[in-house]
Regions:
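Bacterial N-terminal signal peptides that target proteins for export
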Residues: 2-14
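Ser/Thr-centered flexible coil motifs
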Residues: 2-4, 24, 102
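Terminal leader/tail segments of proteins
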Residues: 27-140, 144-179
Length: 179
């Protein structure tokens, strides 16, 4: 293959890969919950380190203030590697800022998250589908990885980003303005 042909093939291949990625990213979450549309993407950075880009996929009429009344998808696109254990433990800490729960609930939820949440690498996506009064279903790179069928867990877990007591108020405010 001549150099110009290799370059054209490389450019064509990269374009095809970029199109595939764009399509898979834009179509994955709607497939998880039909009728949803993406909100603005928001970046979480901690101490100057980018952690993930967060996006809500919501149906018309969704309100951040009454998030627990609506089905929606939360999508986190990771920008760095993190251990599933760290994600699980941090989730419990953040959930405690949103609402109260017993030590037994904490132990049960932590065990469930430890079983579900994988170690993530840069480029991985964790998606969570909220079902009002039912619980949450989790996906890793578009594959089901588990469910926690506990309405209080789900309300507090998604409250990490959506409750007024969130430790990420800039993300919540941007979503309020963008919806």
């Amino acid at each position: 293959m001549t150099a110009p042909r290799r370059q054209r093939f490389f450019s064509w291949s990269m374009g095809l890969i970029a199109c595939h990625l764009a399509l898979s990213l834009s179509q994955a979450s709607p497939a998880l919950l039909p009728g949803v549309k993406p909100s603005s993407q928001q970046r979480l950075s901690v101490w100057g380190f980018d952690v993930y880009d967060a996006r809500l996929w919501v149906r018309p009429g969704f309100s951040v203030a009454s998030y627990s009344a609506h089905a929606f998808v939360l999508e986190l696109s990771y920008l760095r590697s993190l251990e599933g254990e760290a994600l699980s433990k941090r989730s419990i800490d953040e959930m405690r800022k949103v609402g109260a729960f017993s030590r037994d609930q904490e132990n049960n939820w932590l065990k469930a998250m430890l079983d579900i949440f994988p170690n993530v690498q840069k480029g991985d996506r964790l998606q969570a589908v909220y079902a009002p009064n039912a619980g949450a279903e989790f996906f890793f790179n578009d594959k089901v990885i588990g469910r926690i069928q506990d309405p209080l867990f789900a309300q507090l877990f998604f409250g990490i980003w959506l409750h007024e007591s969130t430790s990420a108020p800039a993300i919540r405010q941007a979503w309020i303005k963008g919806l």
